[in-house]
Curated annotation (Swiss-Prot):
The gene is Ccdc33. Pfam families: C2 (PF00168). Disulfide bonds: none annotated. This is Coiled-coil domain-containing protein 33. Residues 263-398 form the C2 domain. Residues 946-956, 972-985 have a biased composition (Polar residues). Residues 228-263, 821-842, 931-985 are annotated as: Disordered. GO terms for biological process: spermatogenesis. One of its GO terms (cellular component) is peroxisome. It comes from Mus musculus (Mouse). Keywords: Coiled coil. Residues 599-745, 885-928 form a coiled coil.
C-alpha cells in the first residue's frame, strides 16, 4: 500500500485548528464481535489504553464495561472462554468497553501515540496458575492512519470515526516455533465525551450458541457458595475460604431468622434447575463460619446470614434470603442452609451478591462480603446432560459417632491415579481444597475453574443427622459433555465422610483424615443399566461398601463388608439390588407379573445396547471427521492469517519507509543546523581573537588615559584651591573697603574739645598721626589688577594654580561659631580636596632675614609655595618654570602678597597703638571727671580701677571695640600651624 500523504481536502496547517484533541475529553467505544484462536484451550482477552510517549498517561482514564458504572482504570479483562474447535468463532459477554480518555491523552504535537493494546491470555491447569500471554494486537486510537479517514470537522454529537474491522493476534511468545494466536472482529467508535445514557442490554442467549458466559463454573442457572470464613485483620477474623459445593433444593426463606432446619425431612425433594424467564437465580449454600468477632463486652454472638444484592441495599429493601439462627451463641456457627436469590437478567453485569453475618441479639453486622455476579460462570441446562447423584444416608447405625457428619462427593476420571495421589498425601486430592479470596476482589481469575481436574470437582453436603445413623437426602450434579463420557473403566464416584465439627478446630475445614470412604466405579455397564431402567428414573444402589469399618461401623457387620478392591466391587456390583421405582418389589405376585415383561424388556435392552454401541461408533467417526474439519479450518485460518500478516507487513513496510524518510529529513535538517552552528562558532572565535588583540592594544592607552584622568583630577583640585583663595581675597577686599568707608565718615560734632581727630579703624603713626588714605586705594587697585591677570591665565591651556599664604587668624574665630570659620566653610566643603593643605609662605627680607629678624622699616616679603600631589606621593613642582611671563606674574603676585602682609602688620600695630591711646584717654577723662589733676608731662604707670568699678557701664560705653577684621588678622589658621610644625620637623 503506497503512502498517499495527508488529506488533500484539509491542509495539515489547519489540522490543529479544526481538531484540538489535547483540549478535549474523548471516548473510545471498542466492542468485540467475535474471536477465534488457532489452538484449543481456555482464553481471555485483556484490553489496555496506553500512551507510552507520555509518563503517567494512565492517570485519569476511566473504563466502563458493558452497561456498568465507569471506574478509574485503564485496563480490563474479559471472561474466560474455551476454544474447542480451532477456527470456530466465539463471543464474549463482557464485550463492550468504553474508555474515557482525559484531556492531554491525545495530542497533535507529534509526541503522542495513543493506542489500545489487546492481549490474549491462555489459562491452563489450576486456577492459581499464572496466565500465559500468547498473543497481542495494537489498535491505533490517535493519530490514525489514512484508512478509514477521520471526520476532522465533526461536531460534539458526531463521531470522529466509526467502523468495523479485524485484528490479528500476533505472536507474543519468545518461542520462534510459536505461530499466530488468532484474530478478532471488532466495532469501534471515537468521539467527544458524552453524558452516559441508560441502555438495557439483552443478556439472553440463543439456543444455537451454547457458551459459558462468566468466569465461575457451576451448574444450571445457579451458583453455589460453600463454607465461609470471615477474614481476620486486627479483630480476630479469618479470610473467606470457599469452594464449589453441592446443589441444594430451593428452601423457603422466612422474613425473620428461623430456627435450626431439619435435614432429615423431605427425602425426595423436587428440584428445579431452571431459572424464571428473564431472571437469574443464584443458589447459596451456607455451611458455617469461624472466628467471628465477639461483642464489646466479650459475649459470643447469635449469628445468622443475610443474602441480598446491591440494588436491594441501595433501595433499602428487605432481604430476599437469610439463614436460621444458631441454637446457642457461638463464634463458629454451622448452618447448612440453602437460600435462593433472584435478579433481573440485564442486571447481572452490575449487581453484586452481598453476604452479611448478623448478630440476632444486638442486630448488628459482624462481617460482610461482596461478590461480583459478573465473575461467576453460568450453565444453561439445554446445553448439557447432567449427572445427578442423590445421597440418602447410612443403612446401619454407627458406633462412636457423637457429631454430625458431612460428605464430600467427587467424580474422578482415573481412580487408580487418584488413590496413588492420596497415598502420597497430595493436598489437592485430600479433603476439600479451599480458595482464599481477599476483599475487595481484585481479579475475576479467582473464580475461574480449570477445564480438566484429575482430582475431580469436590462438592460438600450439609451436616447429616442424627449422629448414630445420619441422613442427608441431598443431590450432587456433575457436568459431562454427554452421558457416556463420564462412564469408563477408570472413572469412579468417591464419597468421603468427615465430622462436621472439624470446622471448629485451629485450622478451619482441615479435612485431612476421613472417617470413611465409599467408591462406586462408573463403568459402561452401569451406564447401560441406567439407560434401560424402568421409567428412566436412574439406578439405586444400596449398601455401598465403606472403607475402614473398624473405626466407622458396628463390630457385628464389619467382617461381612467387602473391601475397596476393584475386583471385589465388580463381583458385588452384579448382585446389587436395582430398583426402578420407589416402592419395594418383594411381593411374589408382582414378580410373576413382571416375568413376561422382563423377556420383552431384555430384548429392548439388547436393542438399546446395540443402538448405544452404534451411537458410540458414530460418535467416534464424527469426532474423527470433526478433527479433520478442524485441521482444514486451521489450515484455512492459517492461510487467511498469513494473508493478513502479509498485508500487515506491507503496511508496516510502508510505515517504516515513511518513518525512515522523515528520519532522513530530520537528519538532514539537524546536519544543516550543526554546520550552521559550526560556522557561527568559527566566526565567534575569530571575533574573540580580534577583541583580545584590540584589548591588548588598548591596555597602554587605558593606562595613559588613567594618568591623564589623574592629572585632570589634580588640576580640578588646584582650581578649587584657587577659587578658595579668591574667596579669601574677596573677604580681604571687603575688609579693606569697610576700613575705607570708616575712614571717610565725618568727624562727630559732639567730640570733646581738644581731642585729636582720629578715624575709626585707621592706624596712627608713631607720633599719633594718621596714615594716608592713598595707601588703601593703592592696595585695592593692585588687587583688581591681579584678579584680571588671574582670569586671563585661567583661560589658557595650562592653568596656573597657586596657593596663597593663609592670613593669621584669631583662634577664637576658628571655632564652631567663629566668623571666619563660617565664611571659609563653603571653601573647605565636600568639593574641596581633603589632601590639599595651605602651607604658610616664608616671609623674608632682602638679605635673608626672617620676619622676626627683619630690619625696621624694611618691607616683609612673603614667598608663596605651590604644592602638587601625584599618585606616587606628594612632590613640589613649579608650573611657572619655563615661561618668563609666568615668572613675572608670580613675582608680581608675590610682591602684592608681601604688600598685603606688610599693610596688615601696620594695621595691627596701629590698632594696638590706638587701643593704648584710647585707654590712656579714657583714664584721663575719668581723672578729670573725679577732680584728679595731673601735670601734662606725667606718665601714668598703673591706673586704679576704682572708677571703673563704680561705673562699669560707662566704661564699657567709652571703650571702643576693635574691628572684627583686626581680630581676624591676628589669628593664625590651623593649616598654618600644622604645616609650620611639619616644616620644623
Amino acid at each position: 500500500m503506497a503512502f498517499r500523504g495527508p488529506d488533500p481536502y484539509l491542509p495539515a496547517s489547519l489540522l490543529s485548528q479544526r481538531l484540538k484533541a489535547g483540549e478535549k475529553t474523548l471516548d473510545l467505544e471498542f466492542e468485540i464481535l467475535s474471536v477465534g484462536f488457532n489452538e484449543e484451550g481456555r482464553y481471555a482477552l485483556r484490553l489496555s489504553a496506553e500512551n507510552p510517549l507520555q509518563a503517567g498517561s494512565s492517570a485519569g482514564v476511566q473504563l466502563q464495561v458493558n452497561d456498568g458504572d465507569p471506574l478509574p482504570a485503564c485496563s480490563a479483562v474479559t471472561e474466560v472462554i474455551e476454544q474447542q474447535d480451532p477456527g470456530q468463532s466465539l463471543t464474549f459477554t463482557r464485550n463492550k468497553f468504553i474508555f474515557t480518555l482525559p484531556k492531554g491523552f491525545c495530542k497533535n504535537d507529534g509526541q503522542s501515540d495513543a493506542h489500545l493494546r489487546v492481549e490474549a491470555l491462555r489459562l491452563d491447569g489450576s486456577s492459581g496458575q499464572e496466565a500465559q500471554r500468547v498473543g497481542e494486537a495494537i489498535f491505533p486510537i490517535y493519530p490514525r492512519p489514512d484508512e478509514p479517514r477521520m471526520n476532522l470537522t465533526a461536531q460534539d454529537h458526531e463521531d470522529l470515526y466509526r467502523y468495523c474491522g479485524n485484528l490479528a493476534l500476533l505472536r507474543a511468545s519468545e518461542d520462534p516455533t510459536a505461530r499466530h494466536c488468532g484474530g478478532l472482529a471488532y466495532s469501534v467508535a471515537f468521539h467527544v465525551h458524552r453524558d452516559p445514557r441508560s441502555s438495557v442490554s439483552d443478556c439472553q442467549l440463543e439456543p444455537s450458541q451454547p457458551e459459558l458466559q462468566t468466569s465461575r463454573e457451576a451448574l444450571s442457572d445457579k451458583i453455589e457458595e460453600s463454607y465461609m470464613s470471615p477474614f481476620s485483620t486486627d479483630s480476630d477474623q479469618e479470610g473467606l475460604s470457599w469452594e464449589a459445593g453441592p446443589w441444594q433444593h430451593p428452601a423457603q426463606v422466612p422474613e425473620e431468622p428461623q430456627g435450626r432446619l431439619d435435614t432429615s425431612q423431605d427425602p425426595y425433594p423436587a428440584a428445579n434447575y431452571l431459572a424464571p424467564c428473564n431472571k437469574e437465580t443464584i443458589t447459596v449454600t451456607l455451611y458455617g463460619a469461624t472466628n467471628l468477632p465477639a461483642g464489646k463486652d466479650g459475649s459470643e454472638p447469635w449469628p445468622y446470614v443475610v443474602v441480598k444484592t446491591t440494588s436491594e441495599k441501595a433501595n433499602k429493601h428487605s432481604p430476599q434470603a437469610m439463614t436460621s439462627v444458631t441454637s446457642e451463641p457461638t463464634r463458629a456457627p454451622v448452618w447448612g442452609d440453602t437460600v435462593n436469590v433472584e435478579i433481573q437478567a440485564e442486571d447481572t453485569g452490575r449487581e453484586d451478591l452481598i453476604l452479611k453475618v448478623m448478630d440476632n441479639k444486638r442486630k448488628k453486622e459482624l462481617v460482610s462480603y461482596d461478590i461480583p455476579i459478573k465473575y461467576l460462570r453460568i450453565f444453561h441446562p439445554y446445553q448439557f446432560k447432567l449427572e445427578k447423584v442423590f445421597l440418602r444416608g447410612v443403612n446401619e447405625p454407627l458406633v462412636n459417632s457423637l457429631k454430625p457428619m458431612v460428605v464430600i462427593a467427587r467424580v474422578v476420571p482415573n481412580y487408580t491415579e487418584f488413590k496413588a495421589r492420596q497415598a502420597r498425601r497430595d493436598p489437592a486430592s485430600v479433603g476439600l481444597p479451599l480458595t482464599q479470596v481477599s476483599f475487595p476482589i481484585s481479579s475475576p481469575m479467582n473464580f475461574d475453574v480449570p477445564r480438566i481436574n484429575q482430582n475431580g470437582y469436590p462438592q460438600l453436603s450439609k451436616p447429616g443427622g442424627p449422629p448414630e445413623q445420619p441422613l442427608w437426602n441431598q443431590s450432587f450434579l456433575f457436568q459431562a459433555r454427554d452421558g457416556a463420557t463420564s462412564f469408563s473403566e477408570n472413572t469412579a464416584l468417591v464419597l468421603e465422610y468427615y465430622p462436621s465439627a472439624s470446622m471448629q478446630s485451629s485450622e478451619p475445614w482441615a479435612l485431612n483424615q476421613p472417617l470413611g470412604v465409599s467408591v462406586l466405579p462408573l463403568k459402561s455397564r452401569l451406564y447401560h443399566k441406567m439407560l434401560t431402567g424402568k421409567h428412566l428414573q436412574g439406578l439405586q444402589v444400596e449398601r455401598l461398601p465403606i472403607m475402614r469399618p473398624e473405626n466407622f461401623l458396628t463390630p457385628n457387620n464389619s467382617k461381612a463388608l467387602p473391601t475397596i478392591n476393584p475386583k471385589i466391587l465388580d463381583e458385588n456390583l452384579g448382585a446389587i439390588r436395582e430398583s426402578w421405582s420407589m416402592s419395594s418389589l418383594d411381593s411374589a405376585q408382582e414378580v410373576e407379573e413382571l416375568q413376561p415383561r422382563d423377556v420383552e424388556m431384555n430384548n429392548y435392552r439388547r436393542a438399546m445396547q446395540k443402538m448405544a454401541e452404534d451411537i458410540l461408533a458414530l460418535k467416534k467417526q464424527a469426532n474423527i471427521l470433526e478433527e479433520e474439519n478442524g485441521m482444514l479450518r486451521s489450515h484455512l485460518s492459517q492461510q487467511s492469517i498469513e494473508e493478513q500478516s502479509r498485508a500487515e507487513e506491507e503496511n508496516l513496510a510502508v510505515s517504516m519507509k515513511q518513518k525512515l524518510l522523515l528520519n532522513e529529513l530530520d537528519m538532514k535538517r539537524l546536519r544543516d543546523r550543526v554546520q550552521h552552528l559550526q560556522n557561527e562558532l568559527i566566526r565567534k572565535n575569530d571575533r574573540e581573537k580580534e577583541l583580545l588583540l584590540l584589548y591588548q592594544a588598548q591596555q597602554p592607552q587605558a593606562a595613559q588615559l588613567r594618568r591623564y584622568q589623574d592629572k585632570l583630577q589634580k588640576m580640578k583640585a588646584l582650581e578649587d584651591t584657587v577659587r578658595h583663595q579668591e574667596k579669601v581675597i574677596e573677604k580681604m577686599e571687603q575688609i579693606l573697603e569697610e576700613r575705607l568707608c570708616e575712614r571717610k565718615e565725618p568727624i562727630p560734632s559732639n567730640r570733646p574739645q581738644g581731642k585729636p581727630i582720629m578715624a575709626s579703624g585707621i592706624p596712627l603713626g608713631p607720633m599719633g598721626e594718621t596714615l594716608a588714605v592713598d595707601l588703601y586705594s593703592m592696595l585695592l587697585a593692585e588687587n583688581t589688577r591681579l584678579r584680571t591677570e588671574l582670569e586671563k591665565n585661567r583661560q589658557q591651556s595650562a592653568p596656573i594654580i597657586l596657593q596663597q599664604q593663609a592670613l593669621p587668624v584669631d583662634p577664637r574665630e576658628l571655632g564652631a561659631g567663629g566668623d571666619l570659620a563660617e565664611r571659609l566653610q563653603d571653601t573647605n566643603g565636600p568639593g574641596h580636596p581633603k589632601s590639599t593643605e595651605t602651607l604658610p609662605a616664608q616671609v623674608g627680607v632682602p638679605g635673608g632675614y626672617s620676619t622676626a629678624q627683619a630690619a625696621p622699616g624694611a618691607p616683609a616679603v612673603h614667598k608663596p609655595k605651590i604644592n602638587i600631589w601625584s599618585s606616587g606621593g606628594m612632590r613640589t613642582q613649579d608650573f611657572l618654570g619655563g615661561t618668563s611671563d609666568k615668572f613675572n606674574l608670580l613675582a608680581k603676585l608675590e610682591q602684592a602678597q608681601s604688600r598685603i602682609l606688610s599693610l596688615e602688620n601696620q594695621l595691627e600695630e596701629s590698632a594696638r597703638h590706638w587701643a593704648r591711646e584710647k585707654q590712656n584717654l579714657a583714664i584721663r577723662l575719668q581723672e578729670q571727671q573725679h577732680g584728679f589733676g595731673q601735670p601734662p608731662n606725667s606718665i601714668i604707670i598703673d591706673q586704679p580701677n576704682a572708677g571703673a568699678s563704680k561705673n562699669p557701664q560707662q566704661l564699657s560705653k567709652l571703650e571702643p571695640s576693635l574691628p572684627s577684621s583686626d581680630k581676624k588678622l591676628n589669628r593664625p589658621s590651623d593649616s598654618q600651624i600644622e604645616i609650620s610644625n611639619n616644616q620644623k620637623t
